[in-house]
Amino acid sequence: GMKLKFATIQNSNLKDLISLVKPTSEYSFFNFLYETGRLESHIIANFSFTLRWEYEQYIQWVISKLDTVRMGNEVKLIKEYEEGFEIILKNDIQKPIFTKNISVALGVKPLIPEFLENNLNERIFHNSEYQFHSKKGTKNILIVGGGQSALEIVVDLFNDKNSDIESITMVYRELFTHQMEDSQFAEDKIYTEMGLSNFYKLPSELKENLNKQYRFASDGASPHTIEEVYQILYANRYSKIGKQIKFNIYSECSVCDVTETDKDLDIKVTIENIYSKNQKIISADMIILATGYKQYFPKEIFSDEILSKIKKDDNYNVCISENYSLEYEGKGKIFYLNGGKHTHGVVDPNLSLNASRARKIVLSLDKTFPKPVKQDTIFGGTI
């Protein structure tokens, strides 16, 4: 999803940074609401989902309370050092950091179609940069993708009453926009500690198949966003109030070629039906790639010595233990987060199990840390 004023995260606000493992913590989302003087207003507002901008404020609030967090630093290189690691920062003025263990959680990279990787500019860009690009003067917008981010962009464009937009076109490979599989039964089987533990124990080839099967438990669009977009399009077509924007959807299609021309800043886009192979050329002033993200291992920040001691599987993916530590032959431990769909499943990048991940790491380092209270799930068992 996008960080827009109306955008929400598809998680309960009880699944914050800490509440699932310590509900009485001062760092809970509810304590954030209380300490920022908005708890009563938040309850009265009766939000069905957590607003994305408010969750970001919550994260920043937690960071402000932690003296050990150093923002504005960039890691240049991680090397072996005695019993652990030496972390060299890009700002050479700052002293290196020495530590016994490290946790790496650099997130994901935008997934860009290969033929466009070297052609990104002010008019062709990934949706992660959406808010940094002006739409002023743009008349015809093409959105590639049909997931949550793509739909949120549609809502945002229609809400901009001062825009010059005349047409919006969506192109995506699916037959229709799939909604997120977030039923109670799906949550019970996938987004719980028991569900995660059951998945981790499965053989690799089965995990790969299940990740495809469970895809829309992670990557689908929220039902209320799908409904909102459809209602906006309905009003746009039939209300006869205000400016009408031409809207087209080309489903089961992909973009196969993009040619920029100097004439009127026009972009010629060739789209192709993935089954019939029929092609059509359309024009756009701007292309927004809502094409998702990909996990990657940040090998560029590790020394060759460290990389040579990290075990990989037959598909050259790093081997990750259930407690998120890499299978590493050196001294110290390397914990790796948001890079383990191949080991931990579609739940791996999701915010909902942040607290559980953190607890697993702490328990692996500190055997005196209080053991968790076992939580029951209604249908989480297996044989």
Please state what every model-predicted region is:
Residues G1-K22, T177-L196:
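Conserved N-terminal glycine-rich FAD pyrophosphate-binding loop of Rossmann-like flavoproteins
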Residues H42-Q148, E152-I383:
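Flavin (primarily FAD) cofactor-binding/catalytic cores of flavoenzymes
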Residues K5-S19, S28-N31, I124-H126, D164, ...:
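Short, solvent-exposed coil/turn linker segments
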Residues S19-W53, H224:
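A conserved beta-strand/loop capping segment in the N-terminal third of enzymes
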Residues G1, F29-F32, W61, E187:
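Tryptophan-centered motif/residue detector
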Residues G1-M2, S19-T24, N127-Q131, K139:
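Conserved N-terminal glycine/acidic-rich loop preference
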